[in-house]
C-alpha cells in the first residue's frame, strides 16, 4: 500500500519501507543488484494488520528514525487494531505503542495517510495522522511518553482524510496541506507552532472534489514550495501562490480527471527540471515535465503505464547510489499485484547533486 524511505538499519543506505495491508510489511534494501527484504521480526512484518500508511522520522530525538505504521481495518470510524510506532534497541525492533504508558493514546480510528512535521523548526518531530471519520491525531513524545497534541494545536478536525504533506508552504516553519474526501481540504498555517486552517482564504479548499494524492513542488523554480493536488475522478490542481491566494496553473492535460492515487514530484532524468508522476488505478499513469514558468509538458510513457495496475502508493530514492532516482510503485486494494521499480534513461551529460540535511540530533532534517 503506502511507501516511505529511510535508513532503517543505520548502515548509511536508504531502504524502501512498504506497507502490506494484510500481507507482511517490507524493508527493501539494495543488495547484490536486487531489492531484498532485510527485516524479519514479527512486530515489523505485522501480517495480521491492515497497514495502509507509513512515515519515518526521529520522534524521540535519538538520531534514529522511528517508523509510524498506520493501520486501517475498516473504511471509516472506529477500527479494531491500533497503529504502530516502531523503534529499535540494539537491533531489536519494538512498538512504542505497546508500552503501558502509551496505551491511553492509541489511534483507534481508520486513517489513510501520515506525515512527519517539525512544527517548531528545532528538529523535534510530531506525526500528523490523517484519519477518516474521526479526529486527526498529532503525536509527539513528551517526558518519554507518546502524547496526542492535536486538540492543543487546533488540529483535531473530523473529515475524510486522504493525503497529507508538510513543508514551507506559507511560513518559514512547517505548514501542512491535507487533501480530504467528502469535505474541504485543509491548509494549516503554522503560527508559532500551532495551526490555523486557511484553505478557504487561499482558495485551496476544493470542497466539491475528493482529494487523493498530493505533493509539494517548486513549480515556478523561484525557491518556494507550491502544491500539487490530485482528485479522484476530478480535476487535478497545480497551485501556485500569487497575490496571497493560490491559483491552479495546470493545463488541460494535467488537470484532466483520472482515478488518481499518488503524485510524485522529482527530477528523474537529472536535467534540472522536475517531473510529476501521476499514479492512477486501473488506467494509464501519466508523466509531466515542469518547464520554465511552470509550463507542464506531457511525456508519453512507454514503460510505467500500468494500464491494469492497482496502484496505491509510490516513493523515490537513489536506492543503488548511482545518482539516478528510482521510482517504486506499490499495488493492492482490490487485487494483489507485485511491486514495480522504474528508472529514467539519463543523458550522459546530465549531472546531479544530492544534499542530505541533518538536524541537531543527527537524524535526517525532514522538511528542512
Residue ranges of each PLM-predicted region?
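Beta-rich catalytic cores
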Residues: 23, 50-55, 81, 110-112, ...
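Short consensus segments that form the blades of beta-propeller domains
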Residues: 17-18, 44-45, 73-79, 105, ...
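Acidic/hydrophobic-patterned starts of short beta strands in beta-sheet-rich repeat architectures
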Residues: 10-19, 61-70, 121-130, 171-179, ...
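Gly/Ser/Thr/Pro-enriched helix-cap/hinge segments flanking short amphipathic alpha-helices
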Residues: 145, 242-246, 295-311, 320-368
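Asp-box/WD-like beta-propeller blade repeats and closely related beta-sheet repeat scaffolds
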Residues: 48-53, 72, 78-119, 152-155
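Beta-propeller blade repeat segments, especially FG-GAP/WD-type strand-to-loop junctions
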Residues: 24-38, 79-98, 135-149, 184-198, ...
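Beta-propeller blade termini
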Residues: 1-10, 50-61, 111-121, 161-175, ...
Amino acid at each position: 500500500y503506502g511507501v516511505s524511505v529511510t535508513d532503517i538499519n543505520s548502515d548509511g543506505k536508504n531502504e524502501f519501507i512498504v506497507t502490506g495491508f494484510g500481507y507482511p510489511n517490507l524493508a527493501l534494501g539494495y543488495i547484490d543488484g536486487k531489492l531484498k527484504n532485510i527485516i524479519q521480526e514479527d512486530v515489523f512484518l505485522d501480517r495480521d494488520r491492515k497497514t495502509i500508511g507509513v512515515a519515518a522520522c526521529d520522534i524521540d530525538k535519538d538520531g534514529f528514525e522511528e517508523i509510524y505504521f498506520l493501520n486501517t481495518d475498516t473504511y471509516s470510524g472506529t477500527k479494531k487494531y491500533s497503529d504502530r510506532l516502531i523503534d529499535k534497541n540494539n537491533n531489536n525492533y519494538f512498538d512504542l505503542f505497546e508500552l503501558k504508558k502509551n496505551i491511553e493514546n492509541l489511534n483507534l480510528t481508520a486513517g489513510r495517510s501520515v506525515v512527519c512535521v517539525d512544527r517548531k523548526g528545532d528538529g523535534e518531530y510530531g506525526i500528523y495522522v490523517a484519519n477518516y471519520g474521526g479526529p486527526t491525531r498529532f503525536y509527539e513524545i513528551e517526558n518519554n511518553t507518546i502524547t496526542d497534541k492535536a486538540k492543543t494545536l487546533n488540529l483535531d478536525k473530523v473529515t475524510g482524510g486522504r493525503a497529507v504533506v508538510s513543508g514551507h508552504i506559507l511560513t518559514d516553519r512547517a505548514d501542512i496541506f491535507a487533501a480530504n474526501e467528502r469535505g474541504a481540504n485543509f491548509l494549516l498555517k503554522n503560527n508559532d507552532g500551532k495551526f490555523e486552517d486557511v484553505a478557504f482564504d487561499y482558495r485551496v479548499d476544493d470542497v466539491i472534489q475528493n482529494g487523493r494524492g498530493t505533493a509539494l513542488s517548486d513549480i515556478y523554480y523561484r525557491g518556494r514550495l507550491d502544491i500539487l493536488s490530485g482528485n479522484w475522478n476530478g480535476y487535478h490542481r497545480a497551485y501556485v501562490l500569487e497575490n496571497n491566494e493560490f491559483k491552479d496553473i495546470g493545463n488541460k492535460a494535467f488537470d484532466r480527471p483520472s482515478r488518481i492515487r499518488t503524485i510524485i514530484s522529482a527530477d528523474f532524468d537529472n536535467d534540472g527540471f522536475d517531473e510529476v508522476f501521476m499514479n492512477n488505478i486501473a488506467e494509464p499513469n501519466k508523466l509531466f515535465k515542469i518547464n520554465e514558468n511552470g509550463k507542464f509538458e506531457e511525456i508519453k510513457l512507454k514503460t510505467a503505464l500500468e494500464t491494469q495496475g492497482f496502484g496505491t502508493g509510490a516513493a523515490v530514492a537513489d536506492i543503488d547510489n548511482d545518482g539516478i532516482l528510482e521510482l517504486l510503485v506499490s499495488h493492492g486494494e482490490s487485487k494483489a499485484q507485485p511491486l514495480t521499480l522504474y528508472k529514467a534513461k539519463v543523458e550522459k551529460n546530465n549531472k546531479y547533486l544530492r544534499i542530505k540535511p541533518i538536524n541537531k540530533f543527527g537524524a535526517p532534517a525532514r522538511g528542512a
